[in-house]
Amino acid sequence: MAASSSSSASASAMGGGGMRKAPSMEWRWVSTEEDDEGEEDGDTVEAAAAAVGAVGRGGSFGSEEEEDEEDGGGGGEGEGEGEDGEKQKLIRTVPSVDWFDVEGYEVSVAQHIEDSEEFDFGRTMFLALQTLAVVFGDIGISPLYTFDVMFSKYPILGEEDVLGALSLVLYTLISMPLVKYVLVVLWANDDGEGGIFALYSLICRNAKVSLIPNQVHSEKRMSSFRLKLPTPELERSIKVKEKLESSLLLKKLLLGLVLFGTAMFISNGVITPAMSVLSAVSGLKVGIPNASQGLVVMISVVLLVILYSVQRYATSKMGFALGPSLLIWFCCLGGIGIYNLSTYGPAAFKAFNPLYIIYYFGRNPFQAWLSLAGCLLCATGSEAIFANLSYFPVRYVQSMFALLVLPCLVLAYLGQGAFLIANQNSSEQIFFSSIPSGVFWPVFLIANLAALIASRTMTTAIFQCLKQSIALGCFPRLKIIHTSRKFMAKIYIPVVNWFLLFSCLGFILLFRSIYDVGNAYAIAELGVMIMATVYVTIIMLLIWETSIVKVLSFVITFLSLELVFFSSSLSSVGDGGWALIIFASGILMVMFIWNYGSKLKYDSEVKKKLSKDLMRKLGPNLGTIRAPGLGLVYSEIVKGVPAIFGHFLIALPAIHSIIVFVCIRNVPVPVVPQTERFLFQRVCTRGYHMFRCIARYGYKDKNQESQSTFERLLIEGLEKFIQREAVELSLQSGDDIDSDEEPPTPSRTIVAPNGSLYSLDVPLLADFVPSAEVIPEASCSTPQHDPVVDYTQNLELELAFIRQAKQSGAVYLIDNPIVKARKNSWFFKKLIINYFFAFLRNNCRRAMMSMSIPHTNVMQVRLTSYV
């Protein structure tokens, strides 16, 4: 049992060094034969051994040999002999974790409420009001304009037309918002996050479909990646995953669809305020018959300017006013509907018979087909229900829609149908014309307030969508302001806010009526709906593992309906849809150019990364000097040494005493727990204090902490990484250490006047084992070492070394490359990269501006990369 005793002694000795002792259950001794028989037991032990071995050997995190071999290994196993002379190995029984607990910085995580959480009555009522204001504001405005747009091109010819149109509206309202979104799509959320990019992120987390190959194997062990589905037992799900991962065409198609859907969603966010406010203010012509359309447009412009001017201040405190306002609005919708049904008779209830839809198309097929675009407006806001899901549990949203929102909307449409049956010549301002005269002005004011709330809700959803797209590399970086300390999802993007305002005003001033704006509205809504159908279908196949019958039923039913609606809306392209198509195309081009240029830039950086051999040559040739301080080298690549470091050495042949290659990586999850933020590994041998650090953020996280906080977190994480590394090395067998390790190499260590330590004229990647004590100036020593004592001494010295480097200050080395197309590239590539992408890069927010780094601590290296 000599080996066991040695391991125990090592652990005991290391405990005096201030390190956290590894639990004994993580390790066990096995015979070599037993280990060989169990080689096929799974990748867990092998991956763990590889991770420990890589640390023990001082392996490079980014070396080219390790890019595709992270699951191999065996290098972390200690060897010894049992009582019978049997060869034994010390192996891990649990996976080696390469992320480390980091404490001290409190992040205000969005308080998404789980379905299982119990609420008291007061909390429930507060959430009910918040849900109305945040989730259902957009769909609650649809009764203002649905019938107006449906009957804008052809007059009502009889009761059958009204019943047919009303039946279309009722069943569209039931099929799209209720069945598709509330009952199905809401369950496709990404840990509570909704929206088109959340669907894409969910797929990216379960299949490697991203075009930028910056995934890290260890991310699969993050808590957010621990999904129960898909299970490997279902062959269909595995085949779908393999097909998506192996086909470059499918990857590009998925990305193209999500970019198209996002462009349509942003366009929807521009049309919604224009349509909502303009239709609400248009009621003024019913109360004041002499009011002109110019007055309506002017008032709408003023209201929109006020709305976007206070958008930044519309935080959760305003929920106390917005929620009750929407509750009053829905009650008005239901109350007016009941009044009209009691006044004009219950004939509108016949519209629940779907045969009236057939009669409607039979009487005038072309007119009925054209009215489908207007009919879809009753479902506008369905995507906003999903996009604004992050604040509330799914079942709560479902209950609110089924018990309050849907009944009020159905009553409102039934009441308008009853009014139209009795007043078939009134095809304009139907909602306001059906209001009892005694309550007209109060309802008019509440309608305008509800329209403003719906517009604000949609704008907030646009902010969330763009934040997700920026995090996933599909939109230029913008300044993002968090307006609430309690809810992380409440954000404000100044540039986007003013862009939406001017775009919205442009639509209003261009068309000046709800009919032309409504035609564009239908196109935008349908574009988002179709993309949601496609992505939810993929999620059903890949993640939910739904039966093929249910999948086919879902995709055939809803995709067919949406394509029919879409064909009708395309017929009105000349009436107003053309402006939206041009606007959405512009947004799509911006996203495509940014993603395309970013991918080429990343590929160029990967090709230029430095190899170990080149690093060895650079060190001695430049006479590298270790200067006191902490050097943080930022790059986007997750493996290897970035080319910027080589250029830095050529220009200034000196490196700091501690070098950390930092990569800010956005992973396809909403939030990365603070305990899983950093991933560390050594880049070269232990004596030269060079590390790789990947700081991981979700698309909902606040990127990034302040400079001082980030430095503190990084140093704490680095110290814990070194401590854990020393513990794992100490648990290896002493025999293994004696046989495999080279004897320590002497090194000259200098004591600077300020007390800091640094080495002079040392090859960059030479072996270096520091001694336990500070060596006097210009003196050398070769200590006779015991492995356990050496690990303890090296740990203490390295921790002291890091603290001294921290006291000397940190310098940020940032790459600011210029990307250009090669001279022999085709014309359009030169146009995209040299002009459009360069313009976006020069005008977007710099990656490091959010950390508030003092200019005196920043060194920027600008390299020209030809792609």
UniProtKB/Swiss-Prot annotation:
Residues 32-44, 63-84 have a biased composition (Acidic residues). Signal peptide: none annotated. Glycans are attached at residues 340, 425. Keywords: Glycoprotein, Ion transport, Membrane, Potassium, Potassium transport, Transmembrane, Transmembrane helix, Transport. GO terms for biological process: potassium ion transport. It is found in: Membrane. GO terms for cellular component: membrane. Its main location: membrane. InterPro entries: K+_transporter (IPR003855), K_trans_C (IPR053952), K_trans_N (IPR053951). Residues 1-88 are annotated as: Disordered. Residues 146-167, 274-285, 339-365, 422-433, 512-522, 567-572 are extracellular. Residues 1-124, 189-252, 307-317, 387-400, 455-490, 544-545, 594-867 are cytoplasmic. Pfam families: K_trans (PF02705), K_trans_C (PF22776). The chain crosses the membrane at residues 125-145, 168-188, 253-273, 286-306, 318-338, 366-386, 401-421, 434-454, 491-511, 523-543, 546-566, 573-593. One of its GO terms (molecular function) is potassium ion transmembrane transporter activity. Residues 1-13, 45-54 have a biased composition (Low complexity). It is a multi-pass membrane protein. NCBIfam families: kup. Belongs to the HAK/KUP transporter (TC 2.A.72.3) family. High-affinity potassium transporter. This is Probable potassium transporter 15. It comes from Oryza sativa subsp. japonica. The lineage of its organism: Eukaryota, Viridiplantae, Streptophyta, Embryophyta, Tracheophyta.
